[in-house]
């Protein structure tokens, strides 16, 4: 690695540690020529799939566009930055795990909506209104009803799970 101060090609690594939750390595370096110290970061350069848009065009996946869309949806809502970043990491992980070279942007949009549904209902409806191109109030009503049904099903499944777990404990103690 060349020194950013004097351009010398001989630098020595003085310290290495994990950074960015294990996604990168942070290295402290010292130039053997001028003695200046500097920090470098090393991370895997993974190519994410290209997105196939609704209009048939293709474009590279851009994590910043994903982040901007989610942040716009959660704006002025009680959602932490950490929760947003975790959602973005899960979406990017799913993209990488797909192994596809091209990916339908509509599937990506559904993943974003799924993450937002778990983060904040208002953010979910905001995103859905743009993503699904709502034209009138009725479209909002239908989406809210769909959200309520999905949440109701999840709540019922969770309650059933608790009942079954509780029932098995009762049976074991008899």
UniProtKB/Swiss-Prot annotation:
Domain of life: Bacteria
Cofactor-binding details, from the entry: Binds 1 zinc ion.
Entry keyword annotation includes Lipid biosynthesis: no
Disulfide cross-links: none
Obligatory cofactor(s): Zn(2+)
GO molecular function, one term: ATP binding
Record bears the keyword Transcription regulation: yes
GO biological process assignments: negative regulation of DNA-templated transcription
Annotated ranges, domain ATP-cone: 49-139
Keywords tagged on the record: ATP-binding, DNA-binding, Metal-binding, Nucleotide-binding, Repressor, Transcription, Transcription regulation, Zinc, Zinc-finger
Zinc finger (unnamed): 3-34
Family that this chain belongs to: Belongs to the NrdR family.
Biological function: Negatively regulates transcription of bacterial ribonucleotide reductase nrd genes and operons by binding to NrdR-boxes.
Protein name: Transcriptional repressor NrdR
Name of the gene: nrdR
């Amino acid at each position: 690695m060349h020194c950013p101060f004097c351009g010398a090609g001989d630098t020595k690594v003085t310290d290495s540690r994990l950074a960015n939750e294990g996604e990168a390595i942070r290295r402290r370096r010292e130039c053997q020529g001028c003695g200046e110290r500097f920090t470098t970061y090393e991370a895997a350069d993974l190519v994410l799939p290209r997105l196939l848009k609704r209009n048939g065009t293709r474009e590279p996946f851009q994590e910043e566009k994903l982040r901007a869309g989610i942040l716009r949806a959660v704006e002025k809502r009680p959602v932490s930055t950490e929760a947003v970043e975790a959602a973005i990491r899960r979406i990017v992980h799913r993209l990488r795990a797909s192994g596809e070279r091209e990916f339908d942007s509509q599937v990506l949009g559904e993943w974003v909506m799924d993450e937002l549904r778990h983060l904040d209902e208002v953010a979910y409806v905001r995103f859905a209104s743009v993503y699904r191109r709502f034209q009138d109030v009725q479209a909002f009503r239908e989406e809210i009803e769909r959200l309520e049904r999905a949440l109701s099903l999840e709540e019922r499944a969770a309650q059933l799970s608790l009942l079954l777990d509780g029932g098995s404990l009762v049976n074991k103690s008899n």
